[in-house]
Amino acid sequence: MKRTVFAPTRLVGAMAAVLALAGCASISPDGLRGAVQSHTASRLPDGAELPPTDLQAHDAAQHRIDEWLRQPLDMDQSVRIALLNNPGLQARLAQLGVQDADRVQALTLPNPTLTLGRMVNSDEREIERQLSFGLVSLITLPWRSRWQGMQMEQATLTAAQDVLRLAADTRRAWLRAVAARQQLAASERMHEAAEAGAELARRMARVGNFSRLQQARELSIQQDTAAQLARARLAATAEHEQLARLMGLWGRRIDFKLPDQLPAIPQAATQLRAGDDAEATALRERLDLRALRRDLDHLGERRGWARAGAIFGDIGLGYSRNTATDRATGHSDVTRGWEIDLPLPLFDWGGAASGRAQI
């Protein structure tokens, strides 16, 4: 009869591998900003950076923003300022750092529990010692590490999508602000011409060369252009403030300058891909779709564990060493043994957890 000999070295090796896996989990020093930057670098202007976490680097970034604001802002500079200074993006990236810390916490093994007891009666004194820890947390660590990696990849892709969305919104706001400024300049010229026409009509009517009807028409044109000028000023102010909001500017910084007219259409814009190639590229490169795929993969892998984890999620393993000492003779008896705690699924069969995973 062939007997299987249990090799303690295998158990020790497996335990060491699991502990090493737990020890590898660490918080990213930059709050995963580098990972977000790698997903977005090719779609952002050259030199565009995300808000730094270091206080000294933050002060240097604010100094660069002040330097850029001294000159009329082009589109790329507006995007750079928005990425460095937008408070919403800063909060989103800070949340990503918190999620990274939660990932490390989820992969950290729970501390073992040491229980000490001392019981005395008239005949003997008993000392109880027990060391216990959660067995499920230790066994499932490799799977939980994989799941947490999927979740963090999804969170990173979502944050990268937020970065690209802010950059696109800033580009649109810059175009609208410059276009509104250009429209305001045209409205001012039209109003000046209408004022000159109304003044000429007034003088011509004074000497009898214009009728009252002709003068009234010129005055009506002047009033129409004045109303159009007021609307253009309101639109230019609103678009300017919208751009300032996206760039995170306030106070004296909102008095930044913009170009007087829109730039020419870039030559690359006339060579955009169309048809099936454009659709395939969009489906392949959209970060929000990639994030949804990772979320779907994560839910699919965790679905099978949801029910079992809800039922057997509190399995514990403990080692006990008790010493009983006879108070009369001083003789001590030592007992050693293992204990395992198994939850009994009398009330919770994991139906709610399984249903949640299926939704």
Kindly give the residue locations of the regions a language model identified:
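Terminal intrinsically disordered/low-complexity segments used for targeting and assembly
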Residues: 1-81, 233-281
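A ubiquitous short alpha-helical element
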Residues: 59-64, 114-119, 182-187, 262-264, ...
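Amphipathic alpha-helical segments that line or abut small-molecule/effector binding pockets
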Residues: 146-153, 157, 294-297, 357
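A small-residue-enriched
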Residues: 25-47, 80-137, 240, 244-249, ...
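"Short basic amphipathic alpha-helical interaction patches in structured regions
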Residues: 95, 130-131, 143-151, 190
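Periplasmic alpha-helical coiled-coil/stalk elements that build and connect Gram-negative outer-membrane
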Residues: 25, 141, 157-281
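Amphipathic alpha-helical coiled-coil segments and their boundaries
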Residues: 75-78, 85, 92, 134, ...
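Generic structural signal for well-ordered, non-membrane alpha-helices
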Residues: 73, 101, 153, 157, ...
